[in-house]
Amino acid sequence: MEQAPEDQGPQREPYNEWTLELLEELKREAVRHFPRPWLHGLGQHIYETYGDTWTGVEAIIRILQRLLFVHFRIGCQHSRIGILRQRRARNGASRS
């Protein structure tokens, strides 16, 4: 009968500790790019929906990751990552 291999690798950081560190990092980044009252409202919504649970922590992590991804993808003025918007010529000469 097959058996799962023994875990011989280095001890991984506990999930809860890693998750809280990730949340803190995302919050620090989000504050640099979004208004504090807006982020506070998001936090209140998550708290009212999930309470003080790990499900709420995971939900706000997912939301902040998506918001920051889209924000950078659209073209954050603080970042070199993103879509470069080019002005189009009115006469259509730049079309190929």
From Swiss-Prot:
Localization terms from the record: Virion; Host nucleus; Host extracellular space
Gene3D superfamilies named among the record's database cross-references: 6.10.210.10, VpR/VpX protein, C-terminal domain (1.20.5.90)
Matching InterPro entries: RetroV_VpR/X (IPR000012)
Alphabetical UniProt keywords: Activator, AIDS, Apoptosis, Cell cycle, Host G2/M cell cycle arrest by virus, Host nucleus, Host-virus interaction, Ion channel, Ion transport, Modulation of host cell cycle by virus, Phosphoprotein, Transcription, Transcription regulation, Transport, Viral penetration into host nucleus, Virion, Virus entry into host cell
Positions where Phosphoserine occurs in the chain: S79, S94, S96
GO biological process, one term: protein homooligomerization
Reported modifications of this chain: Phosphorylated on several residues by host. These phosphorylations regulate VPR activity for the nuclear import of the HIV-1 pre-integration complex.
Superkingdom per UniProt: Viruses
GO CC terms in record: host cell; host cell nucleus; host extracellular space; virion component
Main location: virion
Region listing for Homooligomerization, in residue ranges: 1-42
Function: During virus replication, may deplete host UNG protein, and incude G2-M cell cycle arrest. Acts by targeting specific host proteins for degradation by the 26S proteasome, through association with the cellular CUL4A-DDB1 E3 ligase complex by direct interaction with host VPRPB/DCAF-1. Cell cycle arrest reportedly occurs within hours of infection and is not blocked by antiviral agents, suggesting that it is initiated by the VPR carried into the virion. Additionally, VPR induces apoptosis in a cell cycle dependent manner suggesting that these two effects are mechanistically linked. During virus entry, plays a role in the transport of the viral pre-integration (PIC) complex to the host nucleus. This function is crucial for viral infection of non-dividing macrophages. May act directly at the nuclear pore complex, by binding nucleoporins phenylalanine-glycine (FG)-repeat regions.
Other comments on record: HIV-1 lineages are divided in three main groups, M (for Major), O (for Outlier), and N (for New, or Non-M, Non-O). The vast majority of strains found worldwide belong to the group M. Group O seems to be endemic to and largely confined to Cameroon and neighboring countries in West Central Africa, where these viruses represent a small minority of HIV-1 strains. The group N is represented by a limited number of isolates from Cameroonian persons. The group M is further subdivided in 9 clades or subtypes (A to D, F to H, J and K).
Family: Belongs to the HIV-1 VPR protein family.
Family matches, as HAMAP family: HIV_VPR (MF_04080)
UniProt subunit comment: Homooligomer, may form homodimer. Interacts with p6-gag region of the Pr55 Gag precursor protein through a (Leu-X-X)4 motif near the C-terminus of the P6gag protein. Interacts with host UNG. May interact with host RAD23A/HHR23A. Interacts with host VPRBP/DCAF1, leading to hijack the CUL4A-RBX1-DDB1-DCAF1/VPRBP complex, mediating ubiquitination of host proteins such as TERT and ZGPAT and arrest of the cell cycle in G2 phase.
Listed name of the protein: Protein Vpr
Organism for this UniProt entry: Human immunodeficiency virus type 1 group M subtype C (isolate 92BR025)
Gene for this chain: vpr
